[in-house]
């Protein structure tokens, strides 16, 4: 992937028996289903909920952007801490942080809705509580991805990351679907439920997820030194960082305007928007789940090969969203978007994971995992700004971004050759 020669990393991650591996994988993926539920509940209701308290599209987007910036800054730190403290401990911290932060966020929204807080005070407190929430919640995914990297081999890493994505997406199906139903009670009910689910998941992880022994660094390297040296511009992972940052920026730009798009194009009320958009998000997540289970778990391709399949699908989806003017067409476009992202997300994470040593998995999970929040820092602000100019501009802009990104991915060949060398080296050591 880089033009500089590098040593081929070895695969000295902890070995588990087949039974232990299946059990650890099952518990991790079950926990991630709950995490996916909690993460996606907010997207279905934030747009209409924000409008109910008098916030503009740009104010709503700025809350997501600020929290995403914090996740971007905190994720690498949590990833490195998972190398030192262990994956399970960091996951539990993140889950409890999510529950508490989400509860505070929902409480401020409640006070603003009933008039106990002025709109400006409510907006500032929502920003503060969401930033606090993000600073601790950002521990979950780096630790989870690193845990999966710990229990998979070089040859099965892409499938393992695909399974992580599939679990999240299954939760993402439940989140908007149940969130839309719960929003029929009150718009805040989904957030209260998400906090309770996070606490239950934390207890589930504490008592059932096996601890994985820490991976020793290669001879001559200390764990702390090796992990701290890994950065965004490391030539082994830099191409993946470019892909991830631009890919997620485009996704965020679209994601944060879709609820407004549904409400304005279809002429829906706030509750109807939450319910209809929740169904659309559920369909999108289902398509993502199908692409990960039906394709990634059955076909062996390199990460960049999967990206070459996924990016054109996403570009087509964004063009369709710009042109769609009916409910069915908008949902169809979101299904395409889900299918494409279901392939692109795990491929990006797996590629970055495979590029580094086993003892660097926590660090790389934090760095790669922060590309999404980086995209969601810039994307929502651009999306809100473009949407105020023209409702279809965010989708055409994202379409334009993905074309040069696809060209960049098509030109990446060295990383695939290096991955083939790693798999061959592992096969030789096994025999």
Regions found by a protein language model. Name each.
Residues 2-22, 210-241, 426-431:
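Juxtamembrane intracellular "pre-TM" segments in multi-pass secondary transporters
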Residues 129-170:
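Cytoplasmic helix-loop-helix junction between adjacent transmembrane helices
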Residues 69-73, 276-299:
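Transmembrane alpha-helices of Major Facilitator/SLC transporters
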Residues 44-59, 256-275:
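Short amphipathic helix-loop junctions that connect adjacent transmembrane helices
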Residues 139-152, 343-357:
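Intracellular juxtamembrane helix-capping segments at the cytosolic ends
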Residues 33, 114-139, 245, 329-343:
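Hydrophobic core of transmembrane alpha-helices in multi-pass small-molecule transporters
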Residues 96-119, 313-325:
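C-terminal ends and interior cores of transmembrane alpha-helices
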Residues 74-87, 290-303, 387:
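Helix-to-loop junctions at the C-terminal end of transmembrane segments
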């Amino acid at each position: 992937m880089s033009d500089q020669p590098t040593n081929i990393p070895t695969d000295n991650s902890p070995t588990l028996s087949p039974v232990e591996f299946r059990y650890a994988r099952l518990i991790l993926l079950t926990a991630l289903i709950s995490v996916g539920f909690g993460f996606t509940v907010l997207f279905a209701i934030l747009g209409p909920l924000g409008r109910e308290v008098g916030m503009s599209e740009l104010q709503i987007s700025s809350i997501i952007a600020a929290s995403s910036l914090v996740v971007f800054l905190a994720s690498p730190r949590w990833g490195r801490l998972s190398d030192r403290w262990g994956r399970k401990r960091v996951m539990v911290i993140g889950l409890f942080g999510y529950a508490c932060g989400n509860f505070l966020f929902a409480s401020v929204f409640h006070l603003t809705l009933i008039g106990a807080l002025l709109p400006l005070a409510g907006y500032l407190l929502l920003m503060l509580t969401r930033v606090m929430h993000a600073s601790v919640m950002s521990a979950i995914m780096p630790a989870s991805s690193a845990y999966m990297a710990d229990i998979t081999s070089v040859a099965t890493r892409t499938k393992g990351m695909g399974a992580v994505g599939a679990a999240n997406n299954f939760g993402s199906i439940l989140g908007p679907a149940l969130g839309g139903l719960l929003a029929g009670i009150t718009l805040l009910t989904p957030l209260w439920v998400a906090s309770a689910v996070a606490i239950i998941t934390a207890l589930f992880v504490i008592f059932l997820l096996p601890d994985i022994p820490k991976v020793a660094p290669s001879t001559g390297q200390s764990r702390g030194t090796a992990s701290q040296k890994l950065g965004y511009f490391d030539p082994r992972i830099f191409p993946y960082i470019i892909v991830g940052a631009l890919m997620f920026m485009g996704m965020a730009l679209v994601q944060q305007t879709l609820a407004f798009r549904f409400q304005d194009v279809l002429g829906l009320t706030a509750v109807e928007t939450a319910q209809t958009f929740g169904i659309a998000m559920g369909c999108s997540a289902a398509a993502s789940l199908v692409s990960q289970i039906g394709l990634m778990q059955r076909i062996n391709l390199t990460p960049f090969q999967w990206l070459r399949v996924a990016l054109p699908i996403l570009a087509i989806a964004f063009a369709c969203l710009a042109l769609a003017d009916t409910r069915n067409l908008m949902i169809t476009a979101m299904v395409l978007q889900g299918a494409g992202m279901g392939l692109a997300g795990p491929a990006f994470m797996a590629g970055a994971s495979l590029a580094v040593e086993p003892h660097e998995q926590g660090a790389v999970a934090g760095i790669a995992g922060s590309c999404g929040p980086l995209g969601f820092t810039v994307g929502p602000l651009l999306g809100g700004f473009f949407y105020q100019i023209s409702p279809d501009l965010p989708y055409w802009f994202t379409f334009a971004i993905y074309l040069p990104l696809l060209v960049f991915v098509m030109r990446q060949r060295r990383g695939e050759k290096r991955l083939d060398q790693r798999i061959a080296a592992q096969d030789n050591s096994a025999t």
